[in-house]
Amino acid sequence: MRLSRFFLPILKENPKEAEIVSHRLMLRAGMLRQEAAGIYAWLPLGHRVLKKIEQIVREEQNRAGAIELLMPTLQLADLWRESGRYDAYGPEMLRIADRHKRELLYGPTNEEMITEIFRAYVKSYKSLPLNLYHIQWKFRDEQRPRFGVMRGREFLMKDAYSFDVDEAAARKSYNRMFVAYLRTFARMGLKAIPMRAETGPIGGDLSHEFIVLAETGESGVYCDRDVLNLPVPGEDVDYDGDLTPIIQQWTSVYAATEDVHDAARYESEVPEANRLNTRGIEVGQIFYFGTKYSDSMKANVAGPDGADAPIHGGSYGVGVSRLVGAIIEACHDENGIKWPEEVAPFRVAILNLKQGDAQTDAACEQLYRELAAKGVDVLYDDTDQRAGAKFATADLIGIPWQVLVGPKGLADGKVELKRRSDGSRETIALAEAVARLAP
């Protein structure tokens, strides 16, 4: 992509309404535009990051055996009355009536609808286990939306729902999602810690929140520092095998949100030097809720003995749009964003330091075409801005690799390669640049 043809409305000043770093940088970098309180238009740069995150989530869900579908944003109110949650959910739910006076709602979550789909088609235990997921926009009418995408009213979410014949099988499904989440967040360059949490209106007796440590987080957290060094399962993890050792390794180390924090246990189990009391950002949460929805909505299957029994369920959410903000909170400096490579809007930025110079233009053009031909996401700054402005833009928007091309270096057949994550620079031969930057 040539920057001269890209829509990148960068702001020079910090927006007054932005209270935290991620919100400020997303607005300054031209990733978002606020259209109403807690509702944003995703501009091209932000949309590219959003799609990268969405794809990682999708790949890891598929790897764990979940199957993708797509449910609508609008749901029938009667489904929620059937489960008993319509009145209990409160003013966060946006209730709507169509022209025929049918009561609808803009879905804040999808337990009811997925249960309705399941019960319409699945009648026997032989079709289980089953895990269905979708990635869809949701709406919760937050009383005080703030912090940009961290606490917006409209948000993109991945929610998965597992269906099993009994509790033992359901807990295996829970463990699969637990491991899938560890891998998902690690691929994004995040250290997300699973912490015991309350189940809230979703229900059930088992839940973990996945928390990214950040002082701007809304959740108070207490954990043993050892959890920061635990290994994340590799790509070869066997989801059909016994995942218990992985789960035990991660859950045996103390880590809890403030809602379920046990101060006495914390002080007795965790050496004082290892205690970490801080704040964090919730980027995902998983639940085992047993027969909560199948009981009320009559979602039964015939078991091995031929008798009908309610299915055991779980739900598993990832805040896809929230993750954009969480990654920025964890990966930034005074100059802007430092995207991990897997989620960066572009992997490489080519900075033409003397636009209009024939040799420099030709070298940049050749490098741009060769990288693009190799499948590299590359942004070529071919604008007539001064070099300092180009450096500032590349740092602000966080491109992991910057190739600085100017007449002085080209006289020796050289370009400068800068790594955004640590600011390191090295001079390399122009002829080597493609091999260095193409994965």
Curated annotation (Swiss-Prot):
Pfam families: HGTP_anticodon (PF03129), tRNA-synt_2b (PF00587). Homodimer. GO terms for biological process: prolyl-tRNA aminoacylation. The gene is proS. Its EC number is 6.1.1.15. One of its GO terms (cellular component) is cytosol. It is found in: Cytoplasm. Keywords: Aminoacyl-tRNA synthetase, ATP-binding, Cytoplasm, Ligase, Nucleotide-binding, Protein biosynthesis. Belongs to the class-II aminoacyl-tRNA synthetase family. ProS type 2 subfamily. Catalyzes the attachment of proline to tRNA(Pro) in a two-step reaction: proline is first activated by ATP to form Pro-AMP and then transferred to the acceptor end of tRNA(Pro). It comes from Rhodopseudomonas palustris (strain BisB5). This is Proline--tRNA ligase.
